[in-house]
Regions:
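Bacterial signal peptide processing site
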Residues: 21-22
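Bacterial N-terminal signal peptides
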Residues: 6-18
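Residue-level preference for non-acidic, small/hydrophobic
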Residues: 32, 36, 48, 54, ...
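Short active-site loop at a secondary-structure junction
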Residues: 39-47, 68-126, 164-177, 247-250
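Short, conserved catalytic-motif segment at the N-terminal edge
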Residues: 26-81, 101-106, 156, 161, ...
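Short, surface-exposed loop or secondary-structure junction motifs
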Residues: 66, 119-272
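Positively charged n-region of N-terminal signal peptides that target proteins for export
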Residues: 1-4
């Protein structure tokens, strides 16, 4: 993650979510407004939503989504979720498990034979739970190469290293590599690319109309909020890095209202289980 990017904050209530109400204007809150003061005004901004019993009790944008033209952040602004994206990758895998197309204890190499022999014992469950022992693909990238890598490039990088950080299942270590591989597994098991699968099975059914696993040249991000860094006394756009095009670990864009729909769906699922 690059520093000083535009902030996206979602604070969810602790009680069960019953549904997703239409957008409402909420009065100022001195406590929240005070916390968000650094993101208010003519600076890269943030969006905050607080839900209580599934209903929005606070929804507000602060600052700017696009510094160059002064576009303000609103509840509809779409931010890059970065690692918050991983929950959608995990959900896609579990949908395919329900479909009978994947098994949590299947070897990852069953779907990704390009992985080296050292990865033979890694299961899909271990990729999901950050216990695979995979190397971090960012450590394998050439620092002199400024081209963006994609999920398939992550597999290529890992295939060249016949070693792990530890034996699968013996330790926990947060793994971006694992979720990039899971996105590829979703594609191979479903017969559709990862972004299309998410649209068809998660985003569209839940009414998350503005959420997208973004691919330059393939789709666009509506009402997009960009990231910036303060360089030489001015805000300069630093929205994309060499790893921003990897979808499975961090490439999804979404808004407050769409994430409220996602939270409502998760809570309904939990309620149905009980």
């Amino acid at each position: 993650m690059r520093p000083a990017v535009a902030l996206f904050a979602v604070v969810l209530g602790l009680l069960p979510v019953a549904g997703c109400a239409a957008p409402v204007l909420t009065p100022p809150d001195a406590g929240i407004d005070g916390l968000m003061q650094a993101y208010d005004g003519q600076v890269p901004g943030a969006a905050v939503l607080v839900l209580h019993d599934g209903q929005p009790v606070f929804r507000r944008g602060y600052g700017l989504a696009v510094v160059e033209d002064g576009t303000a952040v609103t509840a509809a602004s779409n931010f890059r979720l970065a690692s918050v994206s991983k929950q959608f990758t995990a959900a896609a895998v579990l949908l395919l498990v329900e479909d009978g197309r994947l098994g949590l204890n299947q070897p990852a190499r069953q779907w990704l034979p390009e992985l080296p022999p050292a990865a033979a014992a890694i299961t899909i469950r271990q990729l999901l739970s950050h216990t695979s022992g995979l190397l971090d693909y960012e450590d394998l990238m050439d620092p002199a190469d400024t081209r963006q890598v994609h999920d398939a490039d992550v597999l290529t990088l890992l295939s060249r290293e016949d070693r792990l950080n530890f034996a699968p299942g013996t330790q926990y270590r947060y793994s971006n590599s694992g979720y990039a591989l899971l996105a590829l597994i979703v594609g191979r098991a479903s017969g559709k690319d990862y972004a299309t699968f998410l649209q068809e099975r998660i985003f569209r059914p839940l009414g998350m109309a503005h959420t997208v696993a973004h691919q330059d040249g393939v789709d666009t991000v509506a009402t997009r909020a960009y990231g910036y860094s303060r360089i030489d006394g001015r805000w300069q756009r630093t929205d994309q890095s060499t790893t921003s095009a990897v979808l499975g670990d961090g490439g999804i864009y979404s808004s407050l209202d769409d994430l409220a729909r996602w939270d409502a769906a998760l809570s309904r699922s939990r309620s149905e289980e009980h």
